[in-house]
């Protein structure tokens, strides 16, 4: 099983671009699990992509009540431990997406970035 995080900006809303990019990156993968942080934007579009492709979804929602502002970063670290790769949709501004990219690189997880 190939576990790939699809993450990115909460303002990212171009599903066709996400689908085309993910299709390209995942073209040689057979058994795929989409890993989602459950945020609006790219994460939710990644879930839509998973449903369209009949890929299972591993959900990692941030626990904002327990961890406050640190919840997103804690969630990113958990996804980084679990996943085999990251596909990030980044506007070069989102701190949460930057943290996910940095976490993946630190864990030596192959990372593809779609800049928007």
Where are these regions (language model features)?
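Acidic/glycine-enriched connector segments
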Residues: 12-116
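Glycine-rich phosphate-binding "P-loop"
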Residues: 1-16
């Amino acid at each position: 099983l190939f576990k790939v995080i699809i993450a990115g900006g909460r303002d990212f809303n171009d599903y066709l671009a996400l689908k085309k990019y993910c299709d390209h990156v995942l073209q040689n993968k057979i058994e795929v699990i989409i890993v989602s942080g459950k945020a609006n934007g790219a994460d939710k579009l990644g879930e839509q992509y998973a449903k369209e492709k009949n890929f299972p979804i591993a959900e990692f929602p941030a626990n904002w009540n327990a961890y406050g502002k640190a919840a997103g970063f804690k969630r990113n670290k958990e996804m980084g431990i679990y996943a085999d790769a990251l596909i990030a949709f980044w506007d070069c501004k989102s701190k949460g997406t930057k943290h996910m990219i940095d976490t993946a690189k630190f864990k030596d997880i192959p990372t593809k970035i779609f800049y928007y």
